[in-house]
Regions:
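Substrate-binding cleft of carbohydrate-active enzyme catalytic domains
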Residues: 1, 5-153
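Substrate-binding cleft/loops of secretory-pathway carbohydrate-active enzymes
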Residues: 60-64, 113-114, 156-183
Length: 183
């Protein structure tokens, strides 16, 4: 999700956390990369994976998962308001570091299995009149899109963001073939 140092690490994670592994880019490293790319007329589009591919985050912050336990599945709990606070904090910092008009949110390969039995996700589905877990994913993507648009950015995602209804201003990248981008 974020292999670079963040302004809010003290709020969410310590550098010496036992779950931490691997290297990271500092904010200065990111700025240097962005400037290097800009000098060559290249735009770096950051990708912050959601709702799936989030094992690292959910191991460090199990309260953002449906189980509330360290890594049981790879999807954020969409019924948990803390998930949105976390994602908005991450996206705010990403927007400060990357000037790209697009922010890629992934949106692919969400398992959605835990959402079917998660009380918070089921309540969100009931409160928002969502028929199924595909629409729950669409709810997350749409809500993130509204946040990004309010900050002058555009949402970019893989073709699975089409499932459950497309957010109005989203741009879709099809990785599963042409048909996914056409449908």
């Amino acid at each position: 999700l974020f292999p670079y140092t963040t302004l809010f690490r003290s709020k969410y994670c310590r550098f010496d956390a036992p779950e931490a592994s691997g290297g990271y880019y500092t904010q200065d490293d990111i700025r240097e990369l962005v400037n290097y790319a800009r000098e060559r007329h290249v735009t770096i589009i950051p990708e912050i994976e959601m709702p799936a591919h989030s094992e690292e985050v959910l191991t460090a912050y199990p309260e953002l998962s449906c189980s509330g336990e360290p890594y049981k599945n790879a999807d954020f709990c969409v019924g948990n308001e803390k998930t949105f606070t976390f994602l908005e904090d991450v996206l705010t910092e990403v927007m400060e570091l990357f000037p790209s008009q697009y922010i890629h949110v992934g949106g692919d390969e969400a398992g959605k299995v835990a959402w079917k039995t998660c009380p918070k996700c089921q309540k969100r589905m009931q409160d928002e009149h969502l028929a199924n877990v595909d629409e729950l994913q669409s709810y997350l993507i749409h809500r993130v899109e509204v946040f990004l648009n309010a900050h002058g950015r555009k949402l970019l995602g893989w073709d699975e963001i089409l499932q459950g209804g497309l957010a109005p201003n989203a741009t879709v990248m099809s990785w599963r073939g042409e048909q996914g981008g056409i449908d």
